[in-house]
């Protein structure tokens, strides 16, 4: 969190299967905190410090939505949650976005799957929106 927490701030969320304790996520969280954001790196269900079983792509829709809803409702959050990341961390953004949360304001998916026809969050090249 930024040093100045006198007012609620926007949140940047990373949901990862790659271990949120890795230097890359720590460095990104520090960078965004220095820019005035609250940065959160969350291990996906069943990965590293998270409980449960990891089933790729299965829980990302609802777990992403639940995380965004929880973050957005915290008193230290201004009601704005954004997501950023690449690879799996990018793809889970699309999945979370398909279940609309009023708190999710932006996603920045990078280096994501290119087979949109058979993708877990697209059906016949059209986005699954619900």
Predicted regions span which residues?
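Short acidic, gly/pro-rich beta-turn/loop elements at beta-sheet edges
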Residues: 23, 81, 117
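Cap/lid segment of the alpha/beta-hydrolase catalytic domain
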Residues: 3-72, 120-122, 128
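Active-site-proximal cofactor/substrate-binding loop regions of enzyme domains
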Residues: 59-70, 74-76, 81-83, 93, ...
